[in-house]
Amino acid sequence: MTKRTSAKYKIDRRMGENIWGRPKSPVNKREYGPGQHGQRRKNKLSDFGTQLRAKQKLKGYYGDLTEKQFRKIYAEAERVKGDTGEMLVGLLERRLDAIVYRAKFVPTVFAARQFVNHGHVTVNGQRVNIGSYRCKEGDVIQVRERSRQLAIVLEATQLAERDVPDYIEVDYSKMTATFVRTPSLGDVPYPVVMEPNLVVEFYAKN
């Protein structure tokens, strides 16, 4: 197991939820956190604890973003007119690594970030190697031709059930994904309940 895979499962255990819906997640077998104290009985969370957990879960889902990265995205969402929680989700889903993951070009969001960082994708014909690159509606993301035979890509794209959300249009014959529109919270296929409203409450008080 790679360090990144181990870290991913540690996030699941810390949250006590299978946040990516993976069949091999350890929380499918045990419902306590990582470490020697993980099996202690969980106390009911305070409002602060509930809000913090909501933030950590959303931050972890997108590849365990650092607090600095996540706080910057939140600050941008806060400046946009509208519901801050909805804006936050929309900005997160516009990340290039998130779109590569949603398009099922690779199996995990961690793999998507690495895939982008290694220069395997283009946006509107130009190579982009920054996972946090923010896509716009109408942008066309494509796996470079020389990268299409990589084992990680073949494994992901040959899955019988792809379940790509409708705000992304995928053409697997060309290995392209068109970002159609910015989604709202209800559009995003999270395997677990995400509560960006609690993230807003957390930052409002801290």
UniProtKB/Swiss-Prot annotation:
How is this protein annotated for GO cellular component?
A: small ribosomal subunit
Which chain positions lie within coiled-coil regions? none
What's the name of the protein? Small ribosomal subunit protein uS4
GO BP of this protein: ribosomal small subunit biogenesis; translation
Q: Which family does it belong to?
A: Belongs to the universal ribosomal protein uS4 family.
The UniProt subunit note reads as follows: Part of the 30S ribosomal subunit. Contacts protein S5. The interaction surface between S4 and S5 is involved in control of translational fidelity.
HAMAP family per the record? Ribosomal_uS4_B
Q: Which domain of life is it from?
A: Bacteria
This chain's function reads:
One of the primary rRNA binding proteins, it binds directly to 16S rRNA where it nucleates assembly of the body of the 30S subunit. With S5 and S12 plays an important role in translational accuracy.
Every S4 RNA-binding domain range: 94-157
- Record InterPro entries: Ribosomal_uS4 (IPR022801), Ribosomal_uS4_bac-type (IPR005709), Ribosomal_uS4_CS (IPR018079), Ribosomal_uS4_N (IPR001912), S4_RNA-bd (IPR002942), S4_RNA-bd_sf (IPR036986)
Pfam families of this UniProt entry? Answer: Ribosomal_S4, S4
Region named Disordered: 15-46
Query: PROSITE patterns from the entry?
Result: RIBOSOMAL_S4, S4
* Keywords annotated in UniProt: Ribonucleoprotein, Ribosomal protein, RNA-binding, rRNA-binding
Q: Name one GO molecular function term.
A: structural constituent of ribosome
